[in-house]
Design a protein with these regions (language model features):
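Aromatic-residue-lined binding/catalytic grooves and analogous aromatic/hydrophobic interfacial grooves
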Residues: 1-179
Length: 179
């Protein structure tokens, strides 16, 4: 994963996700005699290839999805910023907001994101450029509408008395289950 300053004062973070992650411990795998099920970690004789359960890049034949995030400070009035290894330093302004875009190399369930993936840099830049064409109010409105369409789809109300309303939800559910 690398951090860099991009064109027009964008902060860019790009990298590659692990190509393999094993949730079981080596001890569990070995105790259960399952080394043969994990050729990424063990050779044909059951010896460990690595002493870690998370493999990146060439350790795992280049597998792993690429990603990029781009962050751009926007100054509605005057303002400046410096992007350094230690952070984003904003000055000479009373107001700033940040626009963030992110993309991955995912190109379909049937394609390798590391070999047949799309360019996350170009995608993240395109998303950010499009977002920057809107003012803050419009961006917020569009974001809110998008969020609500995904997460505000259920209206759930429990009929209750004032005493029940004062009771924590977990206790109300417990009480309801007993009736």
């Amino acid at each position: 994963t690398a951090l860099q300053k991009g064109r027009d004062d964008r902060l860019i973070l790009h990298g590659q996700a692990p190509g393999y992650v094993e949730r079981r411990t080596f001890e569990q795998i070995e105790q259960w005699g399952d080394t043969y099920k994990h050729p990424e970690l063990y050779d044909a004789n059951g010896k460990r290839k690595f002493n870690k359960r998370m493999l990146y890049g060439e350790e795992i034949d280049g597998k792993g999805m690429f990603f990029e995030a781009q962050l751009k400070p926007v100054f509605p009035k005057d303002g400046k910023c410096d992007i350094t290894d230690s952070g984003i330093h904003v000055y000479d302004t009373d107001e700033v907001y940040f626009v963030l875009s992110m993309a991955t190399s995912f190109n379909g369930f049937d394609k390798s994101p590391s070999r047949e993936g799309i360019d996350p840099s170009a995608k993240a830049a395109g998303i950010l450029d499009k977002a920057l064409s809107y003012n803050y109010r419009t961006l917020k409105q569009r974001h809110t509408e998008d969020y609500r369409s995904l997460f505000n789809r259920v209206d759930f109300k429990l009929a209750s008395s004032p005493e029940q309303k004062a009771m924590p939800t977990d206790k109300r559910i417990e009480q309801f289950a007993q009736t």
